[in-house]
Amino acid sequence: MEINVYSASNKLESYVISAVEFAMAKFFDVKDLDKYISVDVDFTDLDVEGHCIDAGDGEFSIEIKKDLPLREKMIVLMHELVHMKQHIAGELEFGGIIIGKDGLKCKTTTWMGAEFDEEGTDYFDRPWEIEAFGRQLGLFIRWVESIDEGHHKKWQV
């Protein structure tokens, strides 16, 4: 698996690489991913905390709001890695994106093989968001424990 990190300090870059490897190992047999997965993680100006884009052919782009505190950046990364897992596993698929007055919107969304109507569903009630929010903190805590900074003050774990 290829991991590229942009707009990050050396320390943050090492955390991101470690966290991506950790989360993907929880989801998949990593040696299978090594063959075809590439992810770019960029810390940038965003109106939202983060998002994950499936660019196709095993290429993913994760952008995270650069102004977040370190702990929040890493939790958002875990959230977006759950979405990356959903795309890789074929659980979540966005069928084209349109740009509207309210920003980016998907033409169609497929969740677990069935078309899903996002229009009438609150963001927090979408099943892929329920999974991502439900797993982000647990992944974060287990990752922190794995890097031997378990209850370090900066992580507030």
Predicted regions and their residues:
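Catalytic Zn2+-binding segment of zinc metalloproteases
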Residues: L81-I98
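A short glycine/small-residue-enriched secondary-structure motif
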Residues: A55-F60, L104
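Metalloprotease/metallohydrolase-associated module, dominated by Zn2+-dependent proteases
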Residues: K31-D34, F94-V157
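Short alpha-helical functional segments enriched in proximate histidine and acidic residues
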Residues: V76, M84, I88, R135, ...
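Hydrophobic (often cysteine-bearing) scaffold residues that line and stabilize catalytic clefts
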Residues: L12, V16, M74, F124, ...
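Short pre-active-site segment immediately N-terminal to the catalytic Zn-binding motif
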Residues: F60-L77
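Short coil/turn segments at secondary-structure junctions
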Residues: N4-S7, I64-L68, F116-Y123
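Auxiliary, metal-adjacent structural segments of Zn-dependent hydrolase domains
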Residues: M1-G56, P69-L70
